[in-house]
Amino acid sequence: QNDHEYGGIGVAVADRPGGPYKDALGKPLIDRIVNGAQPIDQFVFRDDGTHYMYYGGWHHCNMVKLSDDLLSVVPFDDGETYKSVTPENYVEGPFMFKRGGKYYFMWSEGGWGGPDYSVAYAIADSPFGPFERIGKILQQDPEIATGAGHHSVIRIPGKDEYYIVYHRRPLGATAMGHRQTCIDRMEFDADGFIKPVKMTFEGVKPVRIK
């Protein structure tokens, strides 16, 4: 691991979601390894008006605070700029969402090119953690697919209805790059824990959002 290895996080801007996008900085926002984290797989999370960014590969995850215009990294109140928030078994692909006053931190485990790629999670009272690993909620199914991981989560506005979007490898596929983007329902039990996701071939039905 050194600063010559592949990685870098940039910022692009556009007038509408469909683009076209242009580089906002002319250089990477983060282009070096800090706390062992390869600068990839960024996720921006807004909490109480503040934007935080979680990122990192190589089994390390950092958290940074973004400026109001999202174009720079600024120090936290304690003066620290990069906070290591790496949970047990973390590999890459961090994701955060808030539900019922709790912070759900999710990540991918295993190697993306193998069958054991999967998604695990933790629940915390703060966006800073600590993030104690609870367990896997998405992993290979010998009847459906292997290598299920690197996800995002969608919530239907105004409803407690969640979906997980991820990639997986079809059964029998051997090429590392042979992956499919899929979506399935993600549900919670009465105590707020995420139920194991059941992969399907059908996915989910369209949902109209006003």
Region roles according to the model:
Residues 1-210:
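Carbohydrate-active catalytic/glycan-binding domains of CAZyme proteins
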